[in-house]
UniProtKB/Swiss-Prot annotation:
<comment type="function">
    <text>NDH-1 shuttles electrons from NADH, via FMN and iron-sulfur (Fe-S) centers, to quinones in the respiratory chain. The immediate electron acceptor for the enzyme in this species is believed to be ubiquinone. Couples the redox reaction to proton translocation (for every two electrons transferred, four hydrogen ions are translocated across the cytoplasmic membrane), and thus conserves the redox energy in a proton gradient. This subunit may bind ubiquinone.</text>
</comment>
<keyword id="KW-0812">Transmembrane</keyword>
<dbReference type="GO" id="GO:0009060">
    <property type="term" value="P:aerobic respiration"/>
</dbReference>
<comment type="similarity">
    <text>Belongs to the complex I subunit 1 family.</text>
</comment>
<dbReference type="InterPro" id="IPR018086">
    <property type="entry name" value="NADH_UbQ_OxRdtase_su1_CS"/>
</dbReference>
<keyword id="KW-0520">NAD</keyword>
<dbReference type="GO" id="GO:0005886">
    <property type="term" value="C:plasma membrane"/>
</dbReference>
<dbReference type="Pfam" id="PF00146">
    <property type="entry name" value="NADHdh"/>
</dbReference>
<keyword id="KW-0874">Quinone</keyword>
<feature type="transmembrane region" description="Helical">
    <location>
        <begin position="206"/>
        <end position="226"/>
    </location>
</feature>
<keyword id="KW-0472">Membrane</keyword>
<dbReference type="GO" id="GO:0016655">
    <property type="term" value="F:oxidoreductase activity, acting on NAD(P)H, quinone or similar compound as acceptor"/>
</dbReference>
<comment type="subunit">
    <text>NDH-1 is composed of 14 different subunits. Subunits NuoA, H, J, K, L, M, N constitute the membrane sector of the complex.</text>
</comment>
<feature type="transmembrane region" description="Helical">
    <location>
        <begin position="176"/>
        <end position="196"/>
    </location>
</feature>
<keyword id="KW-0997">Cell inner membrane</keyword>
<feature type="transmembrane region" description="Helical">
    <location>
        <begin position="261"/>
        <end position="281"/>
    </location>
</feature>
<feature type="transmembrane region" description="Helical">
    <location>
        <begin position="20"/>
        <end position="40"/>
    </location>
</feature>
């Protein structure tokens, strides 16, 4: 579909040597805009959905003053943050202080380039797409470290140390989870990983959701979800910005849009972790059952529903569990999740070589 649009645009332009030079660059810019505008809208309205859902769970009203049912609240928040003064501490490293938020949000946005929204709907259909996502998202920790160091504050630096240790620790468990999915799917291409979940005995009998990876890889799925919460520094793993100890962690010296960019990166990472869970474990754009009454629903709607359910799980966890101590978080990552995922890796390898291989 993306290639067809590119060729159609090429034919509409007048001929000439410059067309072959200008259109590819213009096409790249159009794809970037087509990705960023909906993503920024989704990130903005995720903040509203979180506040509304938390209000429902805590038996109170969420934001309901700006616009009908509070639907314009994210726009009001954005305008408020845009008009706030950006203050830099006098002892801060000015260049690095500005670079920190940029380094935090760039990987969270760049990884979306290889995310497929349908069998032929992806900005870049890369064969090693899952590996590329892992590589890009691992850079995000540098933004946190730079922000903590450049602020020249003990609270910011301590928060950055906590964040970097936590993110690196849970990246290992998440990496093993993704490796298991790659093994059973036989590919690192995200489109092929989704299509591989449409095969099997259950899918052949029209019960597609039983052939998705969430069922045979249930322990791996649970580890991935919990590691995703920790990786994005969300509650109850948000000791990075523990208000009672270090105020706001590595963001303590930031104000205005500098502060907002860190939150945009956090919510963009939530969407990314959620859509990866939908693609790798929940069948992506595949419908749950093979029914004629469901064929009219586009695949991207199924993918959106599954992604929203996973995102809502993030919010439900925030409303339910108390914050963990830092030593408990490290113990969970190193002493429980990594051994469990290593054991699952060995079991999955033996399962693939056995006569009971269900992924043939």
């Amino acid at each position: 579909m993306i290639d067809a649009l590119y060729q159609a645009g090429l034919q509409l332009l007048p001929g000439g040597w410059w067309t072959g030079m200008v259109w590819p660059v213009l096409w790249i810019l159009l794809k970037i805009v087509a990705l960023l505008i909906p993503l920024m809208g989704a990130v903005a309205y995720l903040t509203l959905w979180e506040r509304k859902l938390l209000g429902f769970m805590q038996v109170r009203h969420g934001p309901n003053r700006v616009g009908p049912w509070g639907l314009l609240q994210p726009i009001a928040d954005a305008l408020k943050l845009l008009t706030k003064e950006i203050i830099q501490p006098t002892a801060a490293s000015r260049g690095l202080f500005v670079l920190g938020p940029v380094m935090a949000i760039m990987p969270a946005l760049a990884a979306w380039v290889v995310i497929p929204f349908g069998p032929d709907v992806a900005l870049a259909n890369v064969n090693a797409g899952l590996l590329l996502v892992m590589a890009i998202t691992s850079i995000e920790v540098y933004g946190v470290i730079i922000a903590g160091w450049a602020s020249n504050s003990k609270y910011a630096f301590l928060g950055a140390l906590r964040a970097s240790a936590q993110m690196v620790s849970y990246e290992i468990a998440m990496g093993f989870c993704l490796l298991i999915v790659i093994m059973v799917s036989g590919s690192m291409n995200l489109t092929e990983i989704v299509l591989a979940q449409g095969r099997g005995v259950a899918a052949a009998n029209g019960i597609g959701f039983l052939s998705w990876n969430w069922l045979p890889l249930l322990p791996v799925f649970l580890v991935y979800l919990i590691s995703g919460v920790a990786e994005t520094n969300r509650h109850p793993f948000d000791v990075v910005e523990g208000e009672a100890e270090i105020v706001a962690g590595h963001m303590v010296e930031y104000s205005g849009m500098g502060f907002a960019i860190f939150f945009l990166a956090e919510y963009a990472s939530m969407w990314l972790v959620s859509i990866l869970a939908a693609l790798m474990f929940l069948g992506g754009w595949l419908p749950p059952v093979d029914s004629a009454s469901l064929h009219w629903i586009p695949g991207w709607i199924w993918l959106g529903i599954k992604t929203c359910l996973v995102v809502s799980m993030f919010i439900w966890i925030r409303a339910t569990f108390p914050r963990f101590r830092y030593d408990q978080i490290m113990r969970l990552g190193w002493k429980i999740f990594i051994p469990v995922t290593l054991a699952c890796l060995l079991i999955a390898g033996g399962w693939l070589l056995s006569p009971w291989n269900i992924w043939k």
